[in-house]
């Protein structure tokens, strides 16, 4: 009986630990429970008409997308000077941060990385390349993380972004041991493991630039070699490839793989029909909503950590299949095109009126410093947005965090997520009041 009592006590402790003692689940956020998480529910006849008008501009935008995508292959010199690259090392040297074991990095660690970068020879590479797998762009040439603190921060501050497989790059510089390459793409700059990049020649470049193209519309799509059927890599939403042949069961596409000397070789590969479409995917409300639904629930990943997406990567990948080019950074996305509407100096009511009267559902970005969202329209009288975000915090009158709900995924919410926690003197951030700008994407101008 005594043993049974101990077992019962143990079960109770475990249940409290995993149940009542744990952080609230993402679906405890009222917006996510109440609002439809099916983007098709936000399509209206008026919004559909606005998008049909915008679709007339799509071919021009798609041509611009392709031009930007391949731009690194036409570079002969780096766009970023050595001082700009060295500045990242200096910032980290002043604040080395913490390692994944919770201990503070030694300044000597940063100094060693800078010495290995041999900046006295910058730029020592200067050639065209292509990624041969999905790969992380790092701010410093290391896979070791740098956290803001040793206990609670889940974000690696050395993570810049994630590059899809078969992304054109301009290789600017290499470390002394040749293990890391500093590369530029049309939307980022940073360090890649040399094993993830192949050098490409003019013949390969021509085979890629000639088109036509297909675009991936699902995540983690396996790609196989046509000869032998070997698995080559997986590709995710927004990746693009030259089309070789249409088959009843799928698509034959051209892909780049490395040879033993890490030079790029073009192979014919195969991808499933349901996961790939011709690029650009027609710009219709149904297609945009379908792509949102593909991304809904996708885990949040700071800078693309673990192959996931943050707010700006989510929107960039959402619009890539449609041939609509977006930069990688949320601030740069907000400056995209010429349709930027300043909301900063307006009160909350005037901001809401501007969004309702001038916003084009599914083609308007709402930006606040550090975060970006897609305007979907209204439901239950409220402005609704699609975005990927980490958490909602409730603070007391002194600004101290008293409640934090981890969302950590892409979802549809109002501009007031978490307002149900605004009680007993607590307040949550009001995204409507924090908005600085609304941007109409180029097709909607």
Feature-to-residue mapping (PLM):
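Short, structured beta-strand/loop micro-motifs enriched in basic residues and often containing a Trp
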Residues: 132-154, 213-227, 342-351
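Boundary regions of SH3-family modules and the immediately adjacent low-complexity/disordered segments
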Residues: 26-135, 154, 184-218, 249-289
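Bacterial N-terminal signal peptides
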Residues: 10-19
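Conserved beta-strand/loop element in small beta-rich adapter and peptidoglycan-binding domains
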Residues: 152-175, 229-247
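Aromatic- and glycine-rich peptidoglycan recognition patches
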Residues: 27-37, 45, 187, 195-215, ...
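Second-shell loop/turn segments in exported
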Residues: 153-156, 228, 274-279, 297-306, ...
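Active-site nucleophilic cysteine motif
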Residues: 292, 302-333
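...with weaker cross-activation on analogous glycine-rich loops/strands in unrelated enzymes
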Residues: 162, 327-396
